[in-house]
Amino acid sequence: MKRRTDLDTKSSRKVYKKYEYTEIGSIEEENEASINFYAVVIDACFPYKVDEKKYMCYLKVIDTTHNVKEGDDNFAIVALQSRKFEDLPIIQRCGDIIRVHRAEYNYKDDQHYFKLNMSYSSSWALFSADEEVAPEVIKDEGDDFTYRSYAYSGKQYNFDTQDQKLLKNTRAWNKSYFAKNDVIIDEMYTPLSQARQEEGDFNVVGKVTQIVHRDYYTSDLRVKDTSKATWFLTVSRRKFPRLYEGVIIKIRSVNIDSETERERCLELAPHSNIMTFVPFSRLAKSLDSQISLSPDKVDKELIKKVILTEPVLATTTFGDYSELPLTELSEIFEDVTDKDAVFRARFSILKITPDRVEDYVEEYTPKGAPRSKPVYKVQFLIKDPSTALNDNLYKIYLYSHGDLGKEFFPGVDPSSAQTPSGHSKLRKYASTLMKFNVHIDAVLEKVGGAFFIRDTEMKF
Protein backbone atom coordinates (compact mmCIF):
# COMPACT_ATOMS: atom_id res chain seq x y z
CA MET A 1 0.00 0.00 0.00
CA LYS A 2 1.32 3.40 -0.96
CA ARG A 3 0.83 5.72 2.01
CA ARG A 4 2.24 8.94 0.60
CA THR A 5 2.31 9.92 -3.06
CA ASP A 6 4.35 12.39 -5.05
CA LEU A 7 2.58 11.40 -8.27
CA ASP A 8 1.49 14.36 -10.36
CA THR A 9 -1.55 12.89 -12.06
CA LYS A 10 -2.02 15.90 -14.35
CA SER A 11 1.42 15.57 -15.88
CA SER A 12 1.36 11.80 -16.29
CA ARG A 13 1.71 10.85 -19.95
CA LYS A 14 0.04 7.49 -19.59
CA VAL A 15 -3.45 7.30 -21.08
CA TYR A 16 -5.83 5.80 -18.54
CA LYS A 17 -9.04 3.96 -19.14
CA LYS A 18 -12.14 5.98 -18.36
CA TYR A 19 -14.20 4.25 -15.70
CA GLU A 20 -17.95 4.15 -15.31
CA TYR A 21 -19.03 4.56 -11.69
CA THR A 22 -22.15 3.09 -10.14
CA GLU A 23 -24.17 4.10 -7.08
CA ILE A 24 -24.60 1.25 -4.61
CA GLY A 25 -28.37 1.55 -4.40
CA SER A 26 -28.80 1.33 -8.16
CA ILE A 27 -26.95 -1.97 -8.71
CA GLU A 28 -29.22 -4.75 -9.93
CA GLU A 29 -29.27 -7.87 -7.77
CA GLU A 30 -28.38 -10.11 -10.74
CA ASN A 31 -25.39 -7.99 -11.76
CA GLU A 32 -22.33 -10.06 -12.75
CA ALA A 33 -20.11 -7.30 -14.11
CA SER A 34 -17.30 -5.75 -12.07
CA ILE A 35 -18.26 -2.55 -10.25
CA ASN A 36 -16.52 0.81 -9.79
CA PHE A 37 -17.81 3.17 -7.10
CA TYR A 38 -17.11 5.95 -4.61
CA ALA A 39 -18.26 5.41 -1.02
CA VAL A 40 -17.83 6.68 2.54
CA VAL A 41 -16.22 4.31 5.06
CA ILE A 42 -18.10 4.05 8.35
CA ASP A 43 -16.30 0.99 9.74
CA ALA A 44 -13.09 -0.90 9.00
CA CYS A 45 -11.14 -3.72 10.57
CA PHE A 46 -7.34 -3.69 10.65
CA PRO A 47 -5.80 -5.83 7.87
CA TYR A 48 -4.97 -9.23 9.33
CA LYS A 49 -3.30 -12.48 8.35
CA VAL A 50 -5.59 -15.44 7.59
CA ASP A 51 -2.86 -17.87 6.56
CA GLU A 52 0.56 -17.84 4.90
CA LYS A 53 -0.89 -16.78 1.55
CA LYS A 54 -3.82 -14.57 2.48
CA TYR A 55 -4.49 -11.27 4.25
CA MET A 56 -7.99 -9.83 4.64
CA CYS A 57 -9.67 -6.53 5.45
CA TYR A 58 -13.40 -5.81 5.81
CA LEU A 59 -15.13 -2.43 5.44
CA LYS A 60 -18.65 -1.08 5.85
CA VAL A 61 -19.44 1.67 3.36
CA ILE A 62 -22.35 3.93 2.40
CA ASP A 63 -23.20 6.41 -0.35
CA THR A 64 -26.01 8.79 -1.28
CA THR A 65 -28.28 5.92 -2.35
CA HIS A 66 -27.56 3.42 0.41
CA ASN A 67 -26.91 4.69 3.94
CA VAL A 68 -27.65 4.35 7.64
CA LYS A 69 -30.67 5.97 9.22
CA GLU A 70 -31.90 5.74 12.80
CA GLY A 71 -32.96 2.12 13.34
CA ASP A 72 -32.08 1.17 9.76
CA ASP A 73 -28.47 0.09 9.25
CA ASN A 74 -28.19 0.13 5.46
CA PHE A 75 -24.56 -0.30 4.48
CA ALA A 76 -22.55 -2.37 2.02
CA ILE A 77 -19.74 -4.74 2.97
CA VAL A 78 -16.42 -4.61 1.14
CA ALA A 79 -14.06 -7.57 1.53
CA LEU A 80 -10.47 -7.05 0.37
CA GLN A 81 -8.11 -9.99 -0.08
CA SER A 82 -4.40 -9.96 -0.83
CA ARG A 83 -1.26 -12.05 -0.62
CA LYS A 84 0.58 -9.11 0.97
CA PHE A 85 -0.34 -6.98 3.99
CA GLU A 86 0.80 -3.75 2.31
CA ASP A 87 -1.77 -4.12 -0.49
CA LEU A 88 -4.67 -3.59 1.93
CA PRO A 89 -5.97 -0.25 3.26
CA ILE A 90 -5.47 0.92 6.84
CA ILE A 91 -8.47 3.18 7.50
CA GLN A 92 -8.61 4.86 10.91
CA ARG A 93 -11.07 7.70 10.44
CA CYS A 94 -14.82 7.13 10.25
CA GLY A 95 -16.08 9.24 7.34
CA ASP A 96 -13.15 9.15 4.94
CA ILE A 97 -13.79 8.27 1.29
CA ILE A 98 -12.76 5.21 -0.71
CA ARG A 99 -12.75 4.74 -4.47
CA VAL A 100 -13.02 1.14 -5.66
CA HIS A 101 -12.22 -0.22 -9.12
CA ARG A 102 -13.17 -3.65 -10.48
CA ALA A 103 -15.00 -5.17 -7.52
CA GLU A 104 -16.95 -8.40 -7.75
CA TYR A 105 -20.57 -7.96 -6.66
CA ASN A 106 -22.99 -10.20 -4.79
CA TYR A 107 -26.39 -9.57 -3.21
CA LYS A 108 -27.44 -11.92 -0.43
CA ASP A 109 -29.92 -11.67 2.46
CA ASP A 110 -30.74 -8.04 1.62
CA GLN A 111 -27.05 -7.13 1.83
CA HIS A 112 -24.72 -5.68 -0.82
CA TYR A 113 -21.32 -7.41 -0.89
CA PHE A 114 -18.23 -6.34 -2.81
CA LYS A 115 -15.05 -8.39 -3.11
CA LEU A 116 -11.66 -7.03 -4.17
CA ASN A 117 -8.87 -9.46 -5.00
CA MET A 118 -5.72 -7.37 -4.89
CA SER A 119 -3.70 -10.14 -6.53
CA TYR A 120 -5.60 -9.59 -9.75
CA SER A 121 -7.16 -6.43 -11.18
CA SER A 122 -8.97 -4.75 -8.26
CA SER A 123 -7.72 -1.46 -6.86
CA TRP A 124 -8.61 1.16 -4.26
CA ALA A 125 -7.70 4.72 -3.30
CA LEU A 126 -8.44 6.66 -0.09
CA PHE A 127 -9.32 10.35 0.06
CA SER A 128 -9.76 12.72 2.98
CA ALA A 129 -13.36 13.51 3.90
CA ASP A 130 -12.61 17.22 3.56
CA GLU A 131 -10.37 19.34 1.37
CA GLU A 132 -7.69 19.51 4.01
CA VAL A 133 -5.01 16.87 4.20
CA ALA A 134 -6.02 13.74 6.06
CA PRO A 135 -4.41 13.17 9.48
CA GLU A 136 -2.68 10.09 8.06
CA VAL A 137 -0.41 12.22 5.89
CA ILE A 138 2.49 14.47 6.78
CA LYS A 139 1.92 17.49 4.59
CA ASP A 140 4.88 19.29 3.08
CA GLU A 141 4.77 22.99 2.34
CA GLY A 142 3.02 23.60 -0.98
CA ASP A 143 1.25 20.23 -1.04
CA ASP A 144 -2.37 20.37 -2.20
CA PHE A 145 -4.43 17.33 -1.25
CA THR A 146 -7.76 18.61 -2.50
CA TYR A 147 -7.82 15.94 -5.19
CA ARG A 148 -5.00 13.68 -4.06
CA SER A 149 -5.29 10.26 -2.51
CA TYR A 150 -3.52 9.84 0.83
CA ALA A 151 -3.17 6.06 0.31
CA TYR A 152 -3.77 3.75 -2.63
CA SER A 153 -3.03 0.26 -3.92
CA GLY A 154 -0.35 -0.37 -6.50
CA LYS A 155 2.40 1.98 -7.63
CA GLN A 156 0.16 4.80 -8.89
CA TYR A 157 -3.46 5.75 -9.45
CA ASN A 158 -5.34 7.61 -12.14
CA PHE A 159 -7.52 10.66 -11.48
CA ASP A 160 -9.31 12.75 -14.10
CA THR A 161 -11.94 15.49 -14.28
CA GLN A 162 -14.72 12.93 -13.79
CA ASP A 163 -13.09 11.86 -10.51
CA GLN A 164 -12.77 15.47 -9.40
CA LYS A 165 -16.51 15.98 -9.81
CA LEU A 166 -17.40 12.71 -8.09
CA LEU A 167 -15.07 13.35 -5.16
CA LYS A 168 -16.37 16.91 -4.75
CA ASN A 169 -19.99 15.73 -4.76
CA THR A 170 -19.26 12.86 -2.36
CA ARG A 171 -17.55 15.23 0.06
CA ALA A 172 -20.45 17.68 -0.04
CA TRP A 173 -23.02 14.97 0.66
CA ASN A 174 -20.80 13.36 3.31
CA LYS A 175 -20.44 16.60 5.28
CA SER A 176 -24.17 17.18 5.30
CA TYR A 177 -24.94 13.55 6.13
CA PHE A 178 -22.51 13.27 9.07
CA ALA A 179 -23.61 16.67 10.40
CA LYS A 180 -27.31 15.67 10.42
CA ASN A 181 -27.08 11.97 11.39
CA ASP A 182 -25.28 9.91 14.02
CA VAL A 183 -24.34 7.37 11.31
CA ILE A 184 -22.96 4.97 13.94
CA ILE A 185 -26.31 4.10 15.51
CA ASP A 186 -26.97 2.39 18.86
CA GLU A 187 -27.33 -1.05 17.29
CA MET A 188 -23.72 -0.91 16.09
CA TYR A 189 -21.97 -0.82 19.48
CA THR A 190 -22.27 -1.93 23.11
CA PRO A 191 -22.40 0.44 26.11
CA LEU A 192 -19.42 -0.23 28.36
CA SER A 193 -21.78 -0.72 31.31
CA GLN A 194 -23.09 -3.83 29.49
CA ALA A 195 -19.70 -5.15 28.34
CA ARG A 196 -19.69 -8.12 30.72
CA GLN A 197 -22.91 -9.39 29.14
CA GLU A 198 -21.17 -9.89 25.79
CA GLU A 199 -19.99 -13.43 25.10
CA GLY A 200 -17.87 -12.62 22.03
CA ASP A 201 -16.22 -9.54 20.58
CA PHE A 202 -18.12 -6.26 20.45
CA ASN A 203 -17.74 -2.63 19.34
CA VAL A 204 -17.31 0.41 21.59
CA VAL A 205 -17.84 4.14 21.02
CA GLY A 206 -16.43 6.44 23.69
CA LYS A 207 -13.84 9.01 24.71
CA VAL A 208 -10.17 8.52 25.58
CA THR A 209 -10.11 10.19 29.00
CA GLN A 210 -6.47 9.42 29.72
CA ILE A 211 -3.53 8.13 27.74
CA VAL A 212 -0.08 7.19 29.00
CA HIS A 213 2.72 6.35 26.60
CA ARG A 214 4.71 3.57 28.23
CA ASP A 215 7.47 3.85 25.63
CA TYR A 216 7.86 4.32 21.88
CA TYR A 217 5.71 1.27 21.17
CA THR A 218 2.86 0.97 23.66
CA SER A 219 0.17 3.20 25.18
CA ASP A 220 -2.31 2.62 27.99
CA LEU A 221 -5.78 4.11 27.49
CA ARG A 222 -8.66 4.83 29.83
CA VAL A 223 -11.90 4.84 27.81
CA LYS A 224 -15.29 6.11 29.00
CA ASP A 225 -18.68 6.26 27.27
CA THR A 226 -22.12 7.78 27.89
CA SER A 227 -23.04 4.93 30.26
CA LYS A 228 -20.39 6.45 32.57
CA ALA A 229 -18.47 3.18 32.69
CA THR A 230 -14.68 3.25 32.42
CA TRP A 231 -12.54 0.47 30.95
CA PHE A 232 -8.83 0.18 30.26
CA LEU A 233 -6.96 -0.84 27.14
CA THR A 234 -3.34 -1.33 26.05
CA VAL A 235 -2.63 -0.48 22.41
CA SER A 236 0.27 -0.41 19.98
CA ARG A 237 1.44 3.11 19.12
CA ARG A 238 2.61 1.81 15.75
CA LYS A 239 -0.88 0.61 14.84
CA PHE A 240 -2.77 3.53 16.40
CA PRO A 241 -0.51 6.61 16.30
CA ARG A 242 -3.17 9.35 16.29
CA LEU A 243 -4.85 8.83 19.67
CA TYR A 244 -4.86 11.57 22.30
CA GLU A 245 -6.74 12.53 25.46
CA GLY A 246 -10.25 13.78 24.70
CA VAL A 247 -10.63 12.17 21.27
CA ILE A 248 -13.86 10.30 20.47
CA ILE A 249 -13.13 6.83 19.11
CA LYS A 250 -14.89 3.80 17.68
CA ILE A 251 -13.26 0.49 18.62
CA ARG A 252 -13.96 -2.35 16.21
CA SER A 253 -13.92 -5.89 17.69
CA VAL A 254 -12.77 -5.77 21.30
CA ASN A 255 -12.99 -8.43 24.01
CA ILE A 256 -12.87 -8.51 27.78
CA ASP A 257 -9.35 -9.46 28.84
CA SER A 258 -9.94 -12.66 30.81
CA GLU A 259 -6.23 -13.47 31.18
CA THR A 260 -5.46 -10.64 33.59
CA GLU A 261 -6.31 -9.98 37.22
CA ARG A 262 -6.85 -6.31 36.44
CA GLU A 263 -10.42 -5.09 36.62
CA ARG A 264 -12.28 -3.78 33.57
CA CYS A 265 -9.57 -4.38 31.00
CA LEU A 266 -10.24 -4.84 27.30
CA GLU A 267 -8.01 -6.52 24.74
CA LEU A 268 -7.65 -6.17 20.99
CA ALA A 269 -7.41 -8.92 18.39
CA PRO A 270 -5.17 -8.71 15.29
CA HIS A 271 -8.15 -7.50 13.22
CA SER A 272 -9.32 -4.96 15.82
CA ASN A 273 -9.23 -1.32 14.79
CA ILE A 274 -9.58 2.06 16.49
CA MET A 275 -11.13 4.82 14.38
CA THR A 276 -11.56 8.52 15.08
CA PHE A 277 -14.31 10.63 13.50
CA VAL A 278 -14.35 13.37 10.87
CA PRO A 279 -14.52 16.86 12.45
CA PHE A 280 -18.09 17.48 11.27
CA SER A 281 -19.51 14.33 12.89
CA ARG A 282 -22.69 15.05 14.87
CA LEU A 283 -22.17 11.94 16.99
CA ALA A 284 -18.59 12.85 17.92
CA LYS A 285 -19.60 16.39 18.91
CA SER A 286 -22.49 15.08 21.00
CA LEU A 287 -20.36 12.50 22.81
CA ASP A 288 -17.63 15.03 23.44
CA SER A 289 -20.09 17.28 25.28
CA GLN A 290 -21.62 14.39 27.26
CA ILE A 291 -18.47 12.57 28.43
CA SER A 292 -16.23 14.37 30.89
CA LEU A 293 -12.51 13.72 31.16
CA SER A 294 -12.69 13.45 34.95
CA PRO A 295 -13.75 10.12 36.48
CA ASP A 296 -17.25 9.66 37.88
CA LYS A 297 -17.69 8.76 41.54
CA VAL A 298 -18.47 5.14 40.75
CA ASP A 299 -15.11 4.78 39.00
CA LYS A 300 -12.80 6.46 41.49
CA GLU A 301 -12.20 3.29 43.51
CA LEU A 302 -11.51 1.37 40.32
CA ILE A 303 -8.97 3.91 39.14
CA LYS A 304 -7.22 3.66 42.50
CA LYS A 305 -6.78 -0.06 41.85
CA VAL A 306 -5.71 0.27 38.23
CA ILE A 307 -3.29 3.15 38.50
CA LEU A 308 -2.92 4.82 35.12
CA THR A 309 0.10 7.03 35.73
CA GLU A 310 3.57 7.21 34.29
CA PRO A 311 5.05 3.72 33.80
CA VAL A 312 7.16 2.48 36.72
CA LEU A 313 9.79 -0.22 37.06
CA ALA A 314 8.94 -2.62 39.87
CA THR A 315 12.27 -4.45 39.89
CA THR A 316 16.01 -3.90 39.91
CA THR A 317 18.82 -6.16 38.69
CA PHE A 318 22.09 -6.94 40.45
CA GLY A 319 25.20 -9.06 39.95
CA ASP A 320 27.43 -9.58 36.94
CA TYR A 321 24.60 -9.32 34.40
CA SER A 322 22.87 -6.18 35.72
CA GLU A 323 24.61 -3.94 33.18
CA LEU A 324 23.67 -6.01 30.13
CA PRO A 325 21.96 -4.02 27.37
CA LEU A 326 18.21 -4.57 27.05
CA THR A 327 17.12 -7.16 24.48
CA GLU A 328 13.61 -7.32 23.01
CA LEU A 329 11.53 -10.44 23.62
CA SER A 330 11.03 -10.92 19.89
CA GLU A 331 14.79 -11.35 19.54
CA ILE A 332 15.21 -13.49 22.65
CA PHE A 333 12.48 -15.97 21.75
CA GLU A 334 13.33 -15.98 18.04
CA ASP A 335 16.31 -18.23 18.80
CA VAL A 336 14.82 -21.73 18.77
CA THR A 337 18.11 -23.47 19.56
CA ASP A 338 18.86 -24.90 23.00
CA LYS A 339 22.05 -22.86 23.35
CA ASP A 340 22.27 -21.43 26.88
CA ALA A 341 22.56 -17.65 27.19
CA VAL A 342 21.80 -14.74 29.53
CA PHE A 343 19.74 -11.66 28.60
CA ARG A 344 18.33 -8.57 30.24
CA ALA A 345 14.78 -7.65 29.21
CA ARG A 346 11.99 -5.26 30.11
CA PHE A 347 8.39 -6.45 29.90
CA SER A 348 4.89 -6.54 31.42
CA ILE A 349 3.37 -9.52 33.19
CA LEU A 350 -0.07 -10.55 31.93
CA LYS A 351 -0.63 -13.69 34.00
CA ILE A 352 0.91 -15.44 36.99
CA THR A 353 0.60 -19.19 37.54
CA PRO A 354 -0.30 -20.68 40.02
CA ASP A 355 -3.29 -18.44 40.70
CA ARG A 356 -2.97 -18.80 44.49
CA VAL A 357 0.13 -17.42 46.24
CA GLU A 358 -0.14 -20.35 48.66
CA ASP A 359 0.95 -22.55 45.74
CA TYR A 360 4.04 -20.52 44.74
CA VAL A 361 6.30 -22.82 46.77
CA GLU A 362 6.93 -26.55 46.43
CA GLU A 363 9.35 -29.00 47.98
CA TYR A 364 12.48 -29.87 45.99
CA THR A 365 15.12 -32.46 46.80
CA PRO A 366 18.54 -31.73 45.26
CA LYS A 367 20.42 -34.72 43.89
CA GLY A 368 22.26 -36.46 46.70
CA ALA A 369 20.71 -34.26 49.40
CA PRO A 370 19.36 -35.95 52.54
CA ARG A 371 16.21 -33.85 52.66
CA SER A 372 14.05 -31.56 50.55
CA LYS A 373 13.85 -27.78 50.72
CA PRO A 374 11.14 -25.27 49.76
CA VAL A 375 11.67 -23.47 46.43
CA TYR A 376 9.72 -20.99 44.36
CA LYS A 377 8.11 -22.43 41.23
CA VAL A 378 6.15 -19.65 39.50
CA GLN A 379 5.36 -19.07 35.84
CA PHE A 380 4.84 -15.65 34.20
CA LEU A 381 3.23 -14.94 30.83
CA ILE A 382 4.80 -11.76 29.46
CA LYS A 383 4.88 -9.33 26.52
CA ASP A 384 6.89 -6.28 25.53
CA PRO A 385 6.52 -3.57 22.82
CA SER A 386 8.34 -5.66 20.21
CA THR A 387 5.64 -8.34 20.49
CA ALA A 388 2.64 -6.00 20.62
CA LEU A 389 1.52 -6.79 17.06
CA ASN A 390 1.28 -10.56 17.53
CA ASP A 391 -0.95 -12.77 19.67
CA ASN A 392 1.91 -14.62 21.34
CA LEU A 393 2.43 -14.69 25.09
CA TYR A 394 5.93 -15.61 26.26
CA LYS A 395 6.60 -17.93 29.18
CA ILE A 396 9.34 -17.41 31.78
CA TYR A 397 9.92 -19.02 35.18
CA LEU A 398 10.84 -18.00 38.69
CA TYR A 399 12.32 -21.31 39.84
CA SER A 400 14.73 -21.15 42.78
CA HIS A 401 15.79 -24.80 42.88
CA GLY A 402 19.37 -23.70 42.14
CA ASP A 403 19.12 -20.69 44.47
CA LEU A 404 18.71 -18.35 41.46
CA GLY A 405 15.64 -16.17 41.81
CA LYS A 406 15.05 -16.77 45.51
CA GLU A 407 15.58 -13.03 46.19
CA PHE A 408 12.85 -11.92 43.74
CA PHE A 409 10.26 -11.22 46.46
CA PRO A 410 12.08 -9.05 49.05
CA GLY A 411 11.72 -10.15 52.64
CA VAL A 412 9.99 -13.39 51.63
CA ASP A 413 12.26 -16.35 50.98
CA PRO A 414 10.68 -19.71 50.05
CA SER A 415 10.61 -20.81 53.69
CA SER A 416 8.83 -17.74 55.05
CA ALA A 417 6.54 -17.70 52.00
CA GLN A 418 4.64 -20.62 53.54
CA THR A 419 3.44 -18.59 56.53
CA PRO A 420 0.30 -16.37 56.76
CA SER A 421 2.55 -13.31 56.88
CA GLY A 422 4.42 -14.52 53.79
CA HIS A 423 1.15 -15.13 51.95
CA SER A 424 0.02 -11.58 52.72
CA LYS A 425 3.24 -10.09 51.35
CA LEU A 426 3.14 -12.26 48.23
CA ARG A 427 -0.42 -11.11 47.47
CA LYS A 428 0.74 -7.49 47.56
CA TYR A 429 3.70 -8.28 45.32
CA ALA A 430 1.54 -10.19 42.83
CA SER A 431 -0.99 -7.35 42.73
CA THR A 432 1.81 -4.88 41.99
CA LEU A 433 3.28 -7.02 39.21
CA MET A 434 -0.12 -7.15 37.47
CA LYS A 435 -0.85 -3.43 37.61
CA PHE A 436 -1.60 -1.64 34.38
CA ASN A 437 1.52 0.53 34.21
CA VAL A 438 4.15 -1.68 35.89
CA HIS A 439 7.17 -2.91 33.94
CA ILE A 440 9.66 -5.56 34.98
CA ASP A 441 13.41 -5.21 34.38
CA ALA A 442 14.89 -8.68 34.76
CA VAL A 443 17.87 -10.87 33.97
CA LEU A 444 16.73 -13.98 32.10
CA GLU A 445 18.88 -17.09 31.82
CA LYS A 446 18.13 -19.57 29.05
CA VAL A 447 18.70 -23.14 30.18
CA GLY A 448 17.71 -26.04 27.95
CA GLY A 449 15.29 -23.90 25.96
CA ALA A 450 13.44 -22.46 28.99
CA PHE A 451 13.95 -18.99 30.50
CA PHE A 452 14.49 -18.40 34.23
CA ILE A 453 14.61 -15.15 36.23
CA ARG A 454 17.86 -14.57 38.11
CA ASP A 455 19.67 -11.65 39.79
CA THR A 456 16.42 -9.66 39.98
CA GLU A 457 14.55 -8.23 42.98
CA MET A 458 11.34 -6.25 43.40
CA LYS A 459 11.94 -2.70 44.68
CA PHE A 460 9.61 -2.85 47.70
Swiss-Prot record:
Gene3D superfamilies: Nucleic acid-binding proteins
Cellular component per GO, a single term: nuclear telomere cap complex
GO MF annotations, alphabetized: G-rich strand telomeric DNA binding; telomerase inhibitor activity
Primary localisation category: nucleus
GO biological process, one term: regulation of telomere maintenance via telomerase
Keywords per UniProt: Chromosome, DNA-binding, Nucleus, Telomere
Any single Pfam family the record assigns to this protein: TEBP_OB2-like
Compartment(s) of residence: Nucleus; Chromosome, Telomere
Family: Belongs to the telombin family.
Protein function: May bind telomeric T4G4 sequences.
Protein name, per record: Telomere-binding protein homolog
